[in-house]
Amino acid sequence: MSNHECNREEHSWQELKADALADDFCQGITHYICDKVYKPLGVAERLLQHPEERLTASAVIYSRARQEVWMVGDCQALIGGKLYENGKPYEQEIAEKRVDLIKEGMLPAEARRQIEPLLVEAMLSGQNKTYTVIDGFPIYREGVKVVSVSSSETVSASSEIVLASDGYAFLKPTLAESEEALANQIANDPQNISSFIATKGLVEGNKSFDDRTYIRFLP
């Protein structure tokens, strides 16, 4: 598979084995999106030039066979109480630009519109080149974080693992604590310009500023 082209061969996502490597997952999910979405729609060539239009996702996966956590894209994990993150490298700078605009008096909706060209530019120059995302094109492997659970000094037999999306501003050991921290963030800093800096804040009609997924288990 080329470093720049959508895969042209059929691939069965169901063939991924229990002892698969993180690279196997990355290749498998990329092939699946290309085969099942882009190729049937005839959009692969256009999306090659327009990464801002691609289907995009992140994933954080626990491999029981390999005792590893794979962080593919913008996600987070607590392993033995230690926080691991894998954010986009450009987001902090753009988020701070949005904060400055709002503090100067600009309405949050307009501040978001002002930074959107910067977000698109970052996608054009960096998506699966300087940071990792699942988008149906070859995944930037250097941006995939693999955490060995078995060799981690902080993990014991009774240690829990938490995997979550980036929708939790402050990831905690339990769902209740994480939801409480998020509720406090929304109540005290709904536009994410102070205690937590982000490229977007709470939009009217929404319950939070981003999607959220949370799972906690014993390895």
Regions found by a protein language model. Give the residues of each.
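PP2C/PPM-type serine/threonine phosphatase catalytic domain
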Residues: 1-219
